[in-house]
Structure formats: C-alpha cells, structure tokens
A protein has these predicted regions:
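Cytosolic regulatory modules rich in charged/polar residues
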Residues: 1-231
Length: 231
C-alpha cells in the first residue's frame, strides 16, 4: 500500500481509529502521513506522495542504477527521477530511459533536463491534474515555498481528481448536490437524496413564475413576444 493511498484511507476513518493507526505506525510513516494531512483538501499537497526517487547531480549513471535497485522497489513510481541538491532544492529531472541510453560513467548533471515544470503544495489540485494531462506527464514534482522538493503527484492520482471534478460538474448540470462518489457508483437512494433539494427549489421557482404569469396573462396574449422573456 503506497503512502498516498494510505492517506486516502485514513481521511475516511473516524478520528479515534486514525489515532490508533498512527500510534501503531513507524515514526517515519507517521511523520509522512501527518505531513500530507496538514494540507488543504483541494491542494496539490493533499494528493501528493512523498515516495519519490531523488538523485544528486554529481552521481554517475552507474551510481543512479545502484540507488534504483536499492530503494526502487519500495516506491510508487521510478519512471521519473528528480535531481536535488543537499537541501532538496529541485535542480532537474530525467527518466529511466535517459539513464539506459547514457554511458555508465556519465554524470547525472550532464543528462538531466534543468527545465522542470513543477507545482507548489498549495496549488489547486485540479490545476495540477490538468497540467499533468496537458504535458502528458507520468508525475509532477511538488515543491514548497522555498522550491524544495517535498513530493510528487502521479498520473493515477491526477486522473482521480479529474474524474471527481467531472462528476461534480455533471451533478451540478443535473441539479444534484455534489457527491464524493463517481456518478455510476452512486446508489439510487443517494442520487434521489442529492437531487431532491434542487428539485424542490425548481418546483418553488416554477410555482412563483406561474403565479406571476397569471397576473400578466392579458399582456402576454396581446404581445406574444413577451413570452420569450419568461424564465
């Protein structure tokens, strides 16, 4: 279970259960979960994972492969690698493909791309998801206010955000209260409960419109064009 998925599960649990889980967790895991939970729900920080693979610019390609073999199996993705300095400032990005095509004694700084597209922890998560889709990225690096790398948003989490926002827009168009579940996974009763408030509002507005129209019936009959302005 990857960290971002663990955070999603923790967010759905009662506070008493969360406390017990965090008590049982290792100090490192507890720190990572708390780090993500502190971000606003609609921010990039709330959907990022802190499990990424970073390299130093003075490493060789051979050193990079050794690091990937050592810790890569514990991470959510190793397709994209990030180059940082000793204080975690983001310097560049490269892919495993770049490593495979390079010589073993090539330096990372010579093959990395220094032009990194990144997002901040407090950026809107929908904007980050749209950027991932626009640039066809597998992951987006997330930095803090001092441009230190703190995590990444992976493409699967971005797709979850896009699905969530699309569902919410669809429900608004259908006169439904936004739901946490995708439309096709929502039960009949939940759908009915979500639509009822909006249907009541529409019914009341239609009733008031009807009452008003009865007072101006003669005017409408004499000038039919006025019906075009009826809401």
């Amino acid at each position: 279970l990857y960290l971002d998925d663990a955070v999603d599960i923790v967010e759905e649990m009662p506070a008493s259960v969360v406390i017990r889980i965090l008590d049982k967790a290792t100090p490192e895991l507890r720190k990572s979960i708390n780090e993500i939970l502190k971000y606003p729900e609609d921010s990039a920080g709330s959907i990022m994972t802190v499990e990424y693979l970073s390299l130093k610019k003075d490493m060789t390609v051979s050193d990079a492969f050794k690091r990937i073999r050592r810790i890569g199996g514990e991470l959510e993705t190793i397709n994209i690698l990030y180059v940082t300095d000793p204080t975690r400032h983001l310097l560049g990005v490269l892919s495993v493909r770049d490593l495979l095509l390079a010589e073993e004694d090539d330096l990372i700084e010579d093959i990395m791309d220094p032009n990194v597209i990144w997002a901040r922890t407090l950026d809107d998560k929908e904007d980050v998801a749209q950027a991932l889709s626009k640039y066809d990225f597998l992951a987006m690096p997330i930095v803090d206010m001092e441009q230190r790398l703190v995590g990444i948003v992976t493409v699967d989490d971005a797709m979850d955000v896009i699905e969530e926002e699309t569902t919410e827009d669809f429900e608004k168009m259908a006169a439904m209260l936004p739901s946490d579940k995708p439309y096709l996974k929502t039960g009949v009763f939940e759908t009915w409960k979500a639509r009822t408030p909006w249907l009541m509002i529409l019914m009341l507005s239609a009733t008031f419109t009807g009452i008003i129209l009865t007072h101006f019936e003669d005017a409408l009959m004499s000038c039919a064009i006025l019906t075009s302005f009826v809401p």
